[in-house]
């Protein structure tokens, strides 16, 4: 019988897992990517709307400073909302579950979609600003909860591949927004409210279909203490009846952590047994955002123009870059279980480091050497490829893998906070760096890529095809502690967690 064959059972991707992955990623991660890019193409039309609306109210147009400030607020509200969403992860996933949080999160997509879609009709740019905060909260929650949910659904030998799927849908969301954002489609005076309002469609589809799929078995067994529901979920996910071995592995994790209860962010920073895990997610998440990925996209249009690309055609080249991003992320899904997480991180950050160094030289010399702009384009594409291989998809996957059930929600809160604050910082600071350093702006990002690469080489272990307990044992040795959570006496000073109730 098939259930007696451990190889088949270990490697099986069932329709339930595949569909749950696609619905969770499309309904949540896709929106993150879509809202990152959707606001770029119609920006001039939206600024005109801001100005005309202001004129209708007070009888005069905004001055340049006030318009720029208002637009900067509009753009920056998205990462600010992402930061707020990250702070909500722990309480929501512990009380509503992983699937329940994703369903609840659709509120933060449908409401802002309506606000943005009807903002022109209502003659209110304030509706757009509020909506950007709300879709930011949606992105902050989804960027943490989707990897957690999929990581807990997946069998260990598919955890890496499924863990990359959220990043794939982020890149697809960016590409779809770039395509819809072509001037011939929706990036025009009539179409921009529709472009912004389309973000609600994936949320509606997720609300309709995700309830038919299982909650995380780990959440059901460890936090809800419902073994029958956990077994039922596992049977649907694995496609066979005998799930006792996996139930026992989850219970082993539960027994190892039972003495400390569920861990808050404050506890997370206090515990010696989690020291290197916490440092690692901070370094990886900061490295992911501070390595210059947003700056590369910010600078790309100027690089394409300097290489002689017609101004009207830059939008198509940008969409082509987005397509490369999607293609390489698809490749990452297939190679992450072959090459491992550590290798892809090292390769990705190394490629980004090299691309930043060469790009600096190319930008400095493009007025002297005629073919240097083409080198700059090659550097942009190389950087996008490198980032899509490792720095973009792997850090969120590792947060799921290097923390056990009790500390995972708090770890995602820390990781998400670092991610969004770093994102916000780059968006705020890079324009000033660009003015001050010009072509040499990317030296800073090259240094960050190099330092992150060195840290990964020295510290980050390979987690491929290991159970959560096996990964934790690696960190027990690194943290030089005798067990999973030896500091039980230290933790008595903290108030008990209510997450298990």
Swiss-Prot record:
Membrane topology qualifier: Multi-pass membrane protein
- Judging by the UniProt lineage, the source's domain of life is Eukaryota
Q: Give the chief site where it resides.
A: membrane
Q: Which residues lie on this side of the membrane: Extracellular?
A: 40-68, 120-126, 183-192, 299-313, 364-371, 434-439
**Does the record carry Transmembrane helix as a key word?**
yes
- So which residues have sugars stuck on them? 51
- Residues holding D-fructose: 32, 167, 288, 296-298, 387, 419-420
**One Pfam annotation, family name?**
Sugar_tr
Q: Does the keyword Phosphoprotein apply?
A: no
GO MF annotations for this entry?
A: D-glucose transmembrane transporter activity; fructose binding; fructose transmembrane transporter activity
Family, according to the entry, reads as follows:
Belongs to the major facilitator superfamily. Sugar transporter (TC 2.A.1.1) family. Glucose transporter subfamily.
User: What task does this protein carry out?
Assistant: Functions as a fructose transporter that has only low activity with other monosaccharides. Can mediate the uptake of deoxyglucose, but with low efficiency. Essential for fructose uptake in the small intestine. Plays a role in the regulation of salt uptake and blood pressure in response to dietary fructose. Required for the development of high blood pressure in response to high dietary fructose intake.
Q: This protein is called what?
A: Solute carrier family 2, facilitated glucose transporter member 5
User: Which species is the source of this protein?
Assistant: Bos taurus
> Which lineage do the record's taxonomy fields give for this organism?
Eukaryota, Metazoa, Chordata, Craniata, Vertebrata
Q: Which gene encodes it?
A: SLC2A5
């Amino acid at each position: 019988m098939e259930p007696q064959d451990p190889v088949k059972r270990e490697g099986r991707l069932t329709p339930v897992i595949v569909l749950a992955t696609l619905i969770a990623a499309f309904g949540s991660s896709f929106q993150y990517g879509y809202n990152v890019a959707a606001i770029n193409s119609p920006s001039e039309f939206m600024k005109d709307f801001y100005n005309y609306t202001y004129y209708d109210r007070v009888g005069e147009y905004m001055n340049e400073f006030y318009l720029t400030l208002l637009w900067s607020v509009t753009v920056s509200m998205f990462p600010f909302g992402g930061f707020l969403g990250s702070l909500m992860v722990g309480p929501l996933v512990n009380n509503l579950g992983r699937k329940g949080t994703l369903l609840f999160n659709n509120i933060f997509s449908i409401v802002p979609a309506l606000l943005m879609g009807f903002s022109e009709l209502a003659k209110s740019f304030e509706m757009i600003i509020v909506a950007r905060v709300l879709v930011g909260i949606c992105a902050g929650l989804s960027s943490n909860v989707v990897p957690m949910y999929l990581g807990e659904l997946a069998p260990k030998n598919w955890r890496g591949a499924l863990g990359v799927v959220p990043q794939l849908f982020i890149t697809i969301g960016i590409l779809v927004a770039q395509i819809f954002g072509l001037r011939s489609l929706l990036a025009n005076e009539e179409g921009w409210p529709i472009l912004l309002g389309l973000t609600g469609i994936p949320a509606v589809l997720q609300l309709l279909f995700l309830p038919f799929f299982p909650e995380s078995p780990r959440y059901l067994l460890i936090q809800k203490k419902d073994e029958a529901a956990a077994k039922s979920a596992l049977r649907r996910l694995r496609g066979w009846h005998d799930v006792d071995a996996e139930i026992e592995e989850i219970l082993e994790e539960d027994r190892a952590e039972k003495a400390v209860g569920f861990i808050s962010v404050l506890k997370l920073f206090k515990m010696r047994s989690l020291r290197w895990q916490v440092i690692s997610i901070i370094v990886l998440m900061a490295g992911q955002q501070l390595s210059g990925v947003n700056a590369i996209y910010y600078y790309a249009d100027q690089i394409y123009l300097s290489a002689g690309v017609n101004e009207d055609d830059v939008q198509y080249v940008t969409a082509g870059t987005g397509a490369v991003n999607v293609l390489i992320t698809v490749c990452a899904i297939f190679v992450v279980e072959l090459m491992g997480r550590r290798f892809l991180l090292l390769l990705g950050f190394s490629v980004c480091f090299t691309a930043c160094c060469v790009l600096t030289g190319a930008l400095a010399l493009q007025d002297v050497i005629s073919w240097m702009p083409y080198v700059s384009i090659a550097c942009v594409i190389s950087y996008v490829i490198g980032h899509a291989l490792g720095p973009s998809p792997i850090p969120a996957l590792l947060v799921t893998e290097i923390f056990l059930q009790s500390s995972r929600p708090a770890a995602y809160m820390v990781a998400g906070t670092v991610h969004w604050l770093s994102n916000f910082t780059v968006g705020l600071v890079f324009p000033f760096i660009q003015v001050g350093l010009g072509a040499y702006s990317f030296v800073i990002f090259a240094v960050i890529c190099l330092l992150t690469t060195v840290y990964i080489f020295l510290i980050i272990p390979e987690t491929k095809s290991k159970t959560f307990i096996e990964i934790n044992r690696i960190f027990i040795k690194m943290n030089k502690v005798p067990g999973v959570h030896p500091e039980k006496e230290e933790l008595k000073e903290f108030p008990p967690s209510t997450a298990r109730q």
